Amino acid sequence: IGPTILMAAIALFSVGFLLNLDDVDAAPEEANYPEVEVIVVGQQWWWEYHYYLDGIEGASQPDFVTANEIVIPVNQDVRIYTTSRDVIHSFWIPRLNGKKDAVPGRTTPWVIQSNEIGRFAGQCTEFCGLSHAYMRMYTVSLSETDFLAWVANQLTIRDPLPEDDPNYEGEQLFISNCSRCHVVNGVTERDVNGTITSDSMAMYGNIEEFRNHSDGTLSQGKYTGAANLTSGAAPNLTHFATRSSYSGSFFELYPGAQEIADQGNYLGLPGSDYARGTLEAWLRNSPKEKPNAQPEQARGMPNLNLSEAQIDLLVDYLVTLD
């Protein structure tokens, strides 16, 4: 009789549990962009992220490209593919997952997921040159609503500023000094008449080009100027001011960014107090600020020998790129 009583008790609790399930709200609809995938590209000494909102396979180019910080929706698996433009790197966000090497000519699939909102620090863990210790990164996890807002903003391009805009001179300085390597979508690829002359995303190629590259001939990002760099690319700065860090996440753009992001206010960073002095120092003499970046060997940002007035104008312009 003992087993009979035991089975009856189990059945009773099971029925109660199943009835309670009927009272639970139906599962929420599948998140927007459920197929979002990201190519994670390592190069000396920073990380780049190519976002494909409807999946990578068959896509000719990414929907948008960002740098240093990979942004993901909370509680959603996001498939990434690690690869490299130059030497072997290793992508590691300790609080989210293990390590994955980024190897030229290979795209290694992986899944990352965060069950909490916040900003999580990472580090390249494969020695990749003298500035390896300064090759950092962040993963930022947002609520679904904030992630959708972030994506919508990243998809926008900028219009050239009119001559009467207070930041017009700064934009012109950027075009003449920085666009040899960096891109601001909608601005740096226009001709003298203001007409867009190329598709900024097309130059980043697709996953097949990364898979077929192993000998230093990768074409992605090898636009004018950056083609002379060892990696053939420099960070896309279209939405520079929406990121909490720069220069391989070695410098914080906003004081207190960690606490702000952990409180779920990452989207509120633009327009808040920023570390102007640090950004000025970076533009004044970047090789001095980031050790062993080797700009003389086409790695890292060189000293542009800007005047103090030019530095002020450039900083004023960069922090408007939200």
Regions found by a protein language model. Name each.
Residues I1-S179, V183-G232, F240, S247-Q297, ...:
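Non-transmembrane, membrane-proximal soluble domains of secreted or membrane proteins
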Residues L237:
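"…together with the soluble PPM/PP2C metallo-phosphatase catalytic core" -> "…together
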Residues D316-L321:
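Aromatic- and Gly/Pro-enriched helix-to-coil junctions and flexible linker segments
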